[in-house]
Structure formats: C-alpha cells, structure tokens
C-alpha cells in the first residue's frame, strides 16, 4: 500500500521539547510499515517549534515571511525524524514533489516538510498523496479524529467515526488559517482531499495508531470520497 502520513509537529515535538525516545518510537513505527511492504511518505509539521518562532517574528514582519519561518521549522523537524530512521531514509529533505518521488523510487521512507507559503503541511501531504496516487492519506494529529466542533474548547463536540469529503468541507470550510495555525484538517487540505477523492483517516498521532491505521483497526475518523 502507498501511504502518506501527515505527522503533526506537536506530536513529534511536544511542548516539553525534543525527546529521543519519542522520536525513536515514531521512527520504529514507520520502519515497521516499510518492512511490511508498504511505501511510506511522511510530511512533518512545524508544531510548537514553528509557533514559538512565528510568535516573535510576527512582531516585526508580515505573514508571508512568517510562513517561510514555519516552513524551515517543518524541515528541521523532518531532519530529526530522518536521523532516527537511519538507512531507511535519505539524509535530504526534498522541497518539491518531483524530488520527493525520486526518494520513494529509491525504496526509502520519504520525509519532507512544507513547500509553499500559506500551505500547511496537511495541504502538502494531501497534494503529495494526489501527486503520487497514494492509496491512503493518514493525518496524525493531537486530536483523535474529526469532531463537529473543536473538542479542545467545546465540551459538546461530537466525534465522527465516518464522514465523506463533502461533510469534511462543511466542517472545515469556515476555519481561517494564518502562519503557525493548527487544526485537525485545514480548509485547503480538505478541498484537495475532496478534489483528489482521497481515502483519508484522521487519528491521534501516537505510534500505535499509526500502525493500526493501515489495518483499519484505528480509533480515529475515516473520510471517504
């Protein structure tokens, strides 16, 4: 199976900072999927690293430049994961999809970050999945699925086990994004998922759920075309 993972920067690099054990656990999960015969791509978010830098930079500059800072943070996080993957990855963070595909064709795990200003890594992962004609897109975040509202600030939010892409658009369509923003699925990614008719799963970004997402035994939300 050809699978693209959108790995939230905040799950790889939590507020407490970098953890050797945490990064190693994610690397082992992706290595195991590769050993099982799957072709694995991982797009890593900027997370707290990006937000900390952007919050300071925003006092001095515009959103476009803040986007560039965020992209660099995603690539730093990508390099950490690449270092933990060892020989299963290439020590290079591609900046476009053609270079990314070359790495996949080398039978390596692809790890990359952001590509364009104003595009979140969710949108990058969805576009990559469309570009390589992936079988599955998995969005691994700090929330365990898609809810009717943001469960982090709405107690009446209801988790949805299965929705279609049109319903996803309705849920995410009213959200606005700025540099460093995070959401379960951002509006642009939702549009790409709908356009490309991508089978998508949203899970809590822990190694166990990453492995379970392939078999279908996950506890997240399945999004169908």
Swiss-Prot record:
GO CC terms of this entry: cytoplasm
EC number per UniProt: 2.7.4.22
One of the protein's GO biological processes: UDP biosynthetic process
Localization terms from the record: Cytoplasm
Keyword rRNA-binding annotated: no
Keyword Lipid metabolism in record: no
Keywords: ATP-binding, Cytoplasm, Kinase, Nucleotide-binding, Pyrimidine biosynthesis, Transferase
PANTHER family reported in the protein's UniProt record: URIDYLATE KINASE (PTHR42833), URIDYLATE KINASE PUMPKIN, CHLOROPLASTIC (PTHR42833:SF4)
Subunit text: Homohexamer.
Record family assignment: Belongs to the UMP kinase family.
Function: Catalyzes the reversible phosphorylation of UMP to UDP.
Protein name per its UniProtKB record: Uridylate kinase
Organism, as annotated: Methanococcus maripaludis (strain C7 / ATCC BAA-1331)
């Amino acid at each position: 199976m050809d699978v693209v993972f959108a790995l939230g920067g905040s799950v790889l690099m939590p507020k407490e900072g970098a953890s050797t054990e945490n990064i190693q656990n994610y690397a082992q999960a992706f290595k195991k999927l590769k050993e099982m015969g799957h072709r694995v791509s991982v797009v890593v978010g900027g997370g707290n690293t990006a937000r900390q830098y952007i919050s300071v930079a925003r006092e001095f500059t515009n959103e476009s430049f803040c986007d560039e800072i965020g992209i660099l943070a995603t690539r730093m996080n990508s390099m950490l994961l690449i270092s933990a993957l060892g020989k299963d990855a290439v020590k290079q963070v591609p900046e476009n999809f053609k270079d990314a595909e070359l790495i996949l064709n080398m039978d390596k795990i692809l790890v990359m970050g952001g590509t364009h200003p104003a595009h979140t890594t969710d949108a990058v992962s969805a576009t990559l999945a469309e570009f390589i004609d992936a079988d599955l897109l998995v969005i691994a975040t700090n929330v365990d699925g898609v809810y009717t509202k943001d469960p982090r600030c709405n107690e009446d939010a209801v988790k949805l086990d299965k929705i279609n892409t049109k319903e996803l658009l309705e849920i995410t369509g009213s959200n606005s994004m700025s540099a460093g923003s995070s959401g379960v699925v951002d509006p642009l990614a939702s549009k790409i998922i709908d356009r490309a008719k991508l089978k998508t799963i949203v899970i809590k970004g822990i190694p166990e759920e990453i492995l379970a997402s392939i078999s279908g035994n996950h506890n997240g939300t399945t999004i169908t075309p």
